[in-house]
Curated annotation (Swiss-Prot):
It comes from the Bacteria. One of its GO terms (cellular component) is periplasmic space. Gene3D superfamilies: Lipid/polyisoprenoid-binding, YceI-like (2.40.128.110). Keywords: Periplasm, Signal. SMART domains: YceI (SM00867). The lineage of its organism: Bacteria, Pseudomonadati, Pseudomonadota, Gammaproteobacteria, Enterobacterales. Its main location: periplasm. This is UPF0312 protein Spro_1887. The keyword Hydrolase does not apply.
Length: 192
């Protein structure tokens, strides 16, 4: 009897651990504020200016064993840009930069995910300021597992770089201020 119980528990544990490695859909946990889309750009070459987008939504599919099944989709409310300075934020929302009246959303949709050393290369199309261009993000799995509320979570950090001019933003900010670095941290809750 004990032998059957141990075998049953072992088989059950193996099935549960195998289930966590299969492709699963995750919703970005923005309700719990466990996700951030941030950026930084040099200010005149003297310092870094940091900003964030406060309103976005999306999800991802994650299969640790087969990254070719992975997908990422994120939609950002461009008017939610926040650099902790009201006048600058107003300027960033203007037609000189994000043109939020005309382009209310920015979107990222992956086209390919592949293993890249200890992390992943997430290749996709970024639509910003009405222009769509390919972008590659370097992503790393931070961790995954059960949460205290009966769910399962996975968290990632990703970094990338874009050129303002590639997205039709041609305001001259000086040569040191043409590239924007993206810093993304997301925690997803697996769909039940």
């Amino acid at each position: 009897m004990l032998k059957k119980t141990v075998l049953g528990l072992t088989a059950g544990a193996m099935l549960l651990s195998a289930g966590s490695a299969l492709a699963a859909d995750y919703k970005i946990d923005k309700q719990g504020q466990h996700a951030f889309i941030e950026f930084r750009i040099q200010h005149l070459g003297y310092s870094w200016l940091y900003g964030t987008f406060k309103d976005f939504d999306g999800g991802f599919t994650f299969d640790e064993k087969d990254p070719s099944k992975d997908k990422v989709n994120v939609t950002i409310n461009t008017a939610s840009v926040d650099t902790n300075h009201a006048e600058r934020d107003k300027h960033l929302r203007s037609a000189e930069f994000l043109n939020v009246e005309k382009n209310k959303q920015a979107k990222f949709e992956s086209t390919e995910v592949k293993k890249n050393g200890e992390g992943y290369a997430v290749v996709g199309n970024l639509t910003l300021n009405g222009v769509t261009k390919p972008v590659t993000l370097d992503a790393k799995l931070i961790g995954q597992g059960n949460d205290p509320w009966g769910g399962y979570r996975a968290g990632f950090e990703a970094n990338g770089k874009i050129k303002l001019k590639d997205f039709g933003i041609t305001t001259d900010l000086g040569p040191a201020s043409q590239d924007v670095e993206l810093i993304i941290s997301v925690e997803g809750v697996r769909a039940k």
